[in-house]
Amino acid sequence: ICDLLTELGGDASVGEIDGAFCDGRYNVNLNGRKMVGTAQRWRQSGGRPVGLVHGALLLENHREELIAAVNRFNQACGLEQRVRADSHIALHEAFAAPDAISRLDGLYRQMLAQVFAH
């Protein structure tokens, strides 16, 4: 994902973003704002590490509604944390969707081919 964002002219990074919901050190960020949240679970199987890894990519700009829901939830749970819409960015805010999705698919397939070639 970072390769795609950089290829398209964005400033891609991985790490925490102040004010992001479900913040973590493996966020995928675009131009200093969170775009992808990730989660992973690792186990040993047959003497090697096996991971279940997934991400949630913000495609369209529904940040205000999303942030309002997260903040309502945090408040209802008695949590002090509040998140901010301007800490996030959607893919379509920065790049044309069909081109980006098609290229992401190609990069993913290329990565899988390399993984299974070794």
List PLM regions with ranges.
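Long, positively charged amphipathic alpha-helical accessory segments at protein N-termini or as interdomain linkers
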Residues: 4-11, 41, 45-118
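Beta-strand scaffold of nucleotide-dependent catalytic cores
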Residues: 37-39
